[in-house]
Amino acid sequence: MLDSRFVREQADRARQALAHRNEDPVMIDAFLGYDTARKDILAEIEALRHKRNVASDTIAQMKKAGQTADEPIAAMREVSAKIKELEVLLAENQEKSDALLMRIPNIPHASVPIGPDESANVTEREVGTPPAFDFAPRPHEEIGEALGIFDFARAAKIAGARFPLYKGAGALMERALINFMLDIHTTEHGYTECLPPLMVNAKTMTGTGQLPKFEEDLFKLERWGFYLIPTAEVPVTNIFADEILNEADLPIKYTAYTPCFRSEAGSYGKDTKGLIRQHQFNKVELVKFAHPEHSYDELEKLLADAETILQRLGLAYRVITLCSGDMGFSAAKTYDIEVWFPAQNRYREISSCSNFEDFQARRANIRFKRPGQKGTGFVHTLNGSGLAVGRTLAAILENFQTKEGAVEIPDTLRPYMRNMAVLSL
């Protein structure tokens, strides 16, 4: 959530930022309209309170003098009733103003390229060389079905479309990748592992920005009012909701493996085969709570932490900076990491690393205290995938496939897979 003072004092910048994000700048004008009305109502309430205080003094003096005060008492009651009406109106105005502010996206950082869509994204670097095959590489879903490690037909029978069923070495590799990623992030990168709830309440979803704007993307348990998490970012970021952290403890770094659940609303007909776009998938998440003065340094470190996994696995990838029109609602700056998929002959997203500055922290009320100073400030929150597990597995199948239909297991993953070197029939 944006700082309301920023919207008031820098309305032109806020309008421009919304236009750069393909959002209607009229939201800023609507907010300012509510703000003006709020000030007018407050001024009227204060004037009436002053009038009531004067009347109260007059009544006291009249009673002291033995005079009848029926008329000023009646007038004071009318003033009090009017004040109550205005207070209700003020509360309604505040509710509408807050609801609107919740739907205004974050302001892009100055380093973010301006553009309407992914065509304006900027490639920062390409790392590694995509493999050259002397045969037509097969897609991961075909490889997995042939090896007997995927069973999409039975997954569809059990749950419907866009659900995976891993078997045998496929399930083993998925688990191996999770453990490999967590081990790197905890032992080498300094993250603390946590295992959060997979269901959260609406307040938690609001804190990270999924609600109220993106409810259609979520799975909701209507009877209980819970939501299935779309990413571990949601519960992990909210660990410190409504808390005040010590400045000396920043940055605080967590990593978490969780299943993730997404409705994939609006993706009908896209990536209908394989592991790329699923309703349920596994992901290892990285979350940071950083000092505002150091959050962009922490973003670069977080990006490097996610890249390490791909480097250790020997997968070719590229890093791109998302333009203003392609960024997520809550982000101030985002890097995407895209891994090479030979059968598709293109890069596909496998991680998104973002700095939200104080946007989420203000919604979730996550503050920090500076020693020797009055008051508190909002921390900056960051997160990134470290990595999406199913897509990593799919990339391994495609990049390390052989003409004979086998798959060579990356050296670094073999200790997690009972020292298996090859997946084959």
UniProtKB/Swiss-Prot annotation:
The keyword Nucleotide-binding applies. Its main location: cytoplasm. It catalyses: tRNA(Ser) + L-serine + ATP = L-seryl-tRNA(Ser) + AMP + diphosphate + H(+); tRNA(Sec) + L-serine + ATP = L-seryl-tRNA(Sec) + AMP + diphosphate + H(+). The keyword Ligase applies. GO terms for molecular function: ATP binding; serine-tRNA ligase activity. This is Serine--tRNA ligase. One of its GO terms (biological process) is selenocysteine biosynthetic process. Gene3D superfamilies: Bira Bifunctional Protein, Domain 2, Serine-tRNA synthetase, tRNA binding domain. Keywords: Aminoacyl-tRNA synthetase, ATP-binding, Cytoplasm, Ligase, Nucleotide-binding, Protein biosynthesis.
